[in-house]
C-alpha cells in the first residue's frame, strides 16, 4: 500500500464520510479538497463556481490539489477533480486511488438537488450525461474500484480489503 489514499467519485458517492472513517482507522490525516477550496476562498463551493465560472473553478481546484502534501493522508477529492489530468496524475503518483462507484440512480437518491453542491456541468448537459462522462474518467485513474451501494460500513470494509 502507498502511504496515502485518495478517494474519487461523484458528489454523493461517500468520499467525505468514508474518508473520515478511513483516516480515523488508519491514523492518517484527512484532507477534503472541497473544504480546502471553501476555506481558501472563504465561500461555499457553489459561490466559488457561480462567481468564477467553470474554467476558473477547475483551476482553483487543481491548485488546491497540487498543494496537498501526501504523508499518511486520506484525500477526499471533489467530484470534478478528474477534469485536471495534471492533478489526477499528481494524486496517482502520491497515493492509491480508490473510485467509489455508485449507480446513477443511487446518486440521484442521495443528492436529489445538486444546485448548491458546486457541481460542474454544462448548462445543456443532463445529470445522467454528466455522470456517464465522469464515470469513464474515474475508472481510468482508479487503482481500485469499490462499489458503495450497501452502506458506509460495507464500503469501508471493502476498501480495507483492497489496500
Functional labels for PLM-detected ranges:
Residues 14:
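Conserved glycine(s) of the Walker
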Residues 10:
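P-loop (Walker A) phosphate-binding loop of NTP-binding proteins
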Residues 7:
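Hydrophobic anchor at the beta1->P-loop junction of P-loop NTPases
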Residues 78-81, 103-105, 151:
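Short glycine-rich anion-binding loops that position phosphate/pyrophosphate groups of nucleotides
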Residues 33-81, 85-89, 132:
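ATP-dependent small-molecule kinase phosphotransfer cores
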Residues 71-72, 94-95, 141-142:
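Short, well-ordered alpha-helix to beta-strand connector turns
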